[in-house]
C-alpha cells in the first residue's frame, strides 16, 4: 500500500513497452534486467540484495508452467479468433520486509504458564483474518514442544502489551513472533534450570530438551506439566515478557540511502487471461504463482494469503473504482457500488506453490 503498487505497475509497464519497441518477449527483457553479476547487486537506495532468488524462481515457473509453449499456443489462438483474445504475462516481485520508519520495527509479548501446563500468550499484533494468532500459537508450542491446543493466544490489548506497532508492512509475524519466542526462551531457561537442579545437575541446564510434551535430560524424563508444577512449588516465576527489534536497519531519509529493510521476499506470478474485445468482459483462465516465504510456519495459511493477495490485486486493477460526485462525496461506498471480486471471478485454474517446497 501507500503508493507501492502504483510504483511497481509503472515499472512493469515500462518493461512491457520496451519489449514491444524492440520486438522482444517481455519475459526476456525482465530476465535481462534482474539483479545479478552484470547488472549489479545494489538497489537504487544502496541496499545490497543479499539473497537473490528471482532468477531461480523465474526459471522454475518458466519451466513448470510451460511459458514458451503456452505463448506459442496463445499466439496461434489469437490468429484464429477475431473477437476473443488471450494474453499471457509472467511478472516477478521483490518486496522489502520492514517498516521504513525504523522505530516501528519493535514488538512486545507477555507469556504466562499455568500449573496445569497450559500457556497464555499475548502479543502486539492484530488478528484480522490473516492467521497471525495461529502462527504465534505455533511458535510458542514449538518452543515448549507442546501441542497447539495447550496454547491460548488472547485478544490483543494494550494493557498487557503497550505501545504496539501497526500490524502492517508484512512484518506482523516477524516482529510479534520473535517477541513471543524470546519470552518463551526466558521461561524455558528457568524451567530447565529448575529441572537440572532437581536432578543435582545444575551445570547441565543448557542440555535440557523440551520434546513431545516432555522435558528430557539424558535418561531423565518428566512431563511438561509435572515440571511446571515442580517449578511452581520451587517458587520459580512462570511469567515473562518478551521484546524484539529488527536488526541491521539504518536509513537516511535526507539522502535516500541505507538499509530500510531486513530482507526481501520474492514472488513470481504467471497469468493467462481471455478478453472479449467487443464488450471488455474478461476471464482469468489460469494462474501459476511461485512465492518465497522462507521456512513456512504454516503453509496452508501462507498459500491462502497468497491466493487472497492475488485476487485483491486483480480487483484493484480491473473492477474496483473510487467514484466521487460533483460535491466531492464518495459514491462508490458500499458493496453494491464498489465492485470487489466475487467467488465467480477467481481463476478457473489457480496453482500456488511455496518456493523450495516439494
Task: Give the predicted meaning of each segment.
Residues 1, 5-93, 97, 138-358:
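C-terminal catalytic domains of large/alpha subunits in multi-subunit enzymes
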Residues 1, 89-118, 123, 127-130, ...:
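Conserved beta-alpha junction segments in alpha/beta enzyme cores
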Residues 133-134:
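Conserved strand-to-helix beginnings and helix N-cap segments that scaffold or border functional pockets
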Amino acid at each position: 500500500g501507500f503508493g507501492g503498487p502504483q510504483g511497481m505497475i509503472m515499472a512493469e509497464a515500462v518493461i512491457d513497452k520496451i519489449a514491444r519497441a524492440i520486438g522482444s518477449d517481455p519475459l526476456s527483457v525482465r530476465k535481462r534486467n534482474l539483479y545479478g553479476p552484470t547488472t549489479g547487486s545494489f538497489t537504487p537506495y544502496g541496499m545490497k540484495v543479499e539473497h537473490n532468488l528471482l532468477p531461480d524462481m523465474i526459471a522454475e515457473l518458466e519451466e513448470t508452467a510451460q511459458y514458451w509453449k503456452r505463448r506459442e499456443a496463445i499466439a496461434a489462438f489469437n490468429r484464429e479468433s477475431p473477437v476473443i483474445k488471450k494474453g499471457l504475462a509472467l511478472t516477478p516481485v521483490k518486496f522489502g520486509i520492514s517498516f521504513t520508519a525504523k522505530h516501528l520495527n519493535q514488538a512486545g509479548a507477555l507469556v504466562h504458564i499455568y500449573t496445569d501446563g497450559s500457556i497464555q500468550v499475548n502479543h502486539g499484533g492484530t488478528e484480522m483474518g490473516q492467521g497471525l494468532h495461529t502462527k504465534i500459537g505455533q511458535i510458542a508450542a514449538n518452543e515448549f514442544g507442546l501441542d497447539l491446543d495447550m496454547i491460548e493466544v488472547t485478544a490483543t490489548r494494550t494493557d498487557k502489551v503497550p505501545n504496539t506497532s501497526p500490524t502492517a508492512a508484512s512484518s506482523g509475524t516477524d516482529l510479534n513472533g520473535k517477541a513471543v519466542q524470546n519470552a518463551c526462551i526466558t521461561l524455558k531457561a528457568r524451567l530447565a534450570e529448575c529441572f537440572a537442579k532437581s536432578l543435582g545437575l545444575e551445570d547441565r541446564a543448557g542440555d535440557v530438551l523440551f520434546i513431545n510434551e516432555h522435558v528430557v535430560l539424558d535418561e531423565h524424563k518428566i512431563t511438561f506439566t509435572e515440571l511446571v508444577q515442580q517449578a511452581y512449588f520451587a517458587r520459580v516465576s512462570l511469567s515473562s515478557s518478551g521484546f524484539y527489534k529488527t536488526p541491521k536497519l539504518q536509513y537516511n531519509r535526507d539522502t535516500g540511502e541505507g538499509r530500510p529493510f531486513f530482507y526481501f521476499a520474492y514472488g513470481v506470478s504467471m497469468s493467462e487471461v481471455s478478453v472479449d474485445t467487443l464488450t471488455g468482459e474478461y476471464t482469468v483462465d489460469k494462474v501459476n504463482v511461485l512465492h518465497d516465504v522462507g521456512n513456512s510456519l504454516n503453509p496452508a495459511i501462507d498459500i491462502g494469503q497468497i491466493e487472497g493477495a492475488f485476487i485483491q490485486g486483480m480487483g484493484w486493477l480491473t473492477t474496483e473504482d473510487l467514484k466521487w460526485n460533483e460535491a466531492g462525496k464518495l459514491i462508490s461506498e458500499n458493496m453494491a457500488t464498489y465492485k470487489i471480486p466475487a467467488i465467480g471471478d477467481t481463476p478457473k485454474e489457480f496453482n500456488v506453490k511455496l518456493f523450495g517446497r516439494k
